[in-house]
Amino acid sequence: MPSTGAALVGALLWAMAMGASALTGLWLDNWETPEKIRFVVLLFAMGAAIAFPVGLFAARLASLDRHWEVALAAAFVCLLAATLAFTGGLFALQYRSYYAEWHAEAFTVRWAFELVFTSLTALYQFVVLGVRLYFPLGFIALAAASVWFARQQR
């Protein structure tokens, strides 16, 4: 079980790293709208902050009483999956809230279809357009966090 301090400090550092990665990607793409840049960076940072404790817990669970190689792989996979899942989920919520204005009344069959397909479209767009913002800094931070985790397990 990860300590509360490690989870909180790690979440803060992970959020800063993923936010910096998104900022670098947007800067390299020559985005010119500061409010949109701030929103995307905040989205990536919030997703990372929520994901880190979950990914850390899953990695510890997967690598319990195993060799350091397993701990390294578990941290890599669990942090990657949690970060993508939570950031993609936040993106889908924002995407859904934007398009909700044109959707049917809540809790109808049509609304349910619109909710599902809007969310799936948002996740698809995040995978296609958003994941690239994790390269190169996010990938380097992921490797560093995985090595840190594996060393902690020794």
Question: Which residue stretches match the model-derived regions?
Answer:
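Membrane-interface helix-boundary motifs at transmembrane edges
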Residues: 31-35, 60-70, 154
